[in-house]
């Protein structure tokens, strides 16, 4: 049942329909669901933080789509050193979760900095949490431990973003305020996957 829900995940459609008209949106890397959503819109400006070279790939994809579209999305690659300036120039920050728990999301590097800066400045931060990404606490913690198992913390492939830095959650149910979001696990804990 969960597999079918993942394949038919309405999260990108909810996001595309809910993004403010003409908004400047900051994304990190190439988020699959948020990337799909911004491609559905022709009135946005996307500031893509070039996390692991993925922001530039997203911008190239947006530009190719714009060549076939009259409106097209305006997209710009931002070096990670410019993350604060990009966030402060945005109307909205999208942080896409590769996994989520009741208290946090796991996202690409730079996401925590972007969310913290935005929250501190009163800029909305929407966590994009697709179907199948809400995990039991033990599974989430195990995943965090695995991606963080590097020689130095700044080499980790992902980082934890506390939900307290998020204003809204975009999910299967639509765009909801953080405190109203259902972040309960979507699947039982598989003990054999831990460790």
Each model region followed by its residue ranges:
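N-terminal active-site beta-alpha-beta segment that forms phosphate/nucleotide-binding
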Residues: 1-77
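Conserved phosphate- and dinucleotide-binding cores of soluble alpha/beta proteins
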Residues: 52-195
């Amino acid at each position: 049942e969960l597999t079918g829900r993942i394949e038919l995940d309405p999260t990108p459609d909810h996001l595309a329909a809910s993004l403010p008209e003409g908004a400047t949106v900051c994304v990190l890397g190439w988020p699959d669901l948020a990337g799909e959503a911004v491609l559905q819109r022709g009135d946005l400006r996307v500031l893509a933080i070039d996390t692991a070279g993925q922001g530039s790939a997203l911008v190239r994809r947006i530009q190719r789509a714009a060549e076939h579209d009259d409106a097209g999305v305006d997209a710009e690659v931002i070096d990670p050193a410019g993350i604060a300036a990009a966030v402060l120039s945005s109307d909205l920050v999208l942080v896409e979760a590769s996994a989520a728990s009741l208290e946090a999301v796991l996202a690409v590097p730079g996401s925590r900095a972007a969310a913290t800066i935005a929250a501190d400045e009163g800029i909305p931060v929407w966590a994009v949490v697709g179907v199948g990404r809400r995990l039991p606490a033990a599974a989430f913690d195990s995943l965090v431990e695995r991606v963080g198992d590097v020689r130095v913390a700044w080499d980790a492939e992902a980082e934890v973003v506390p939900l307290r830095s998020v204003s809204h959650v975009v999910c299967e149910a639509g765009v909801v305020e953080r405190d109203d979001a259902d972040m309960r696990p979507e699947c039982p804990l598989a003990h054999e996957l831990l460790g």
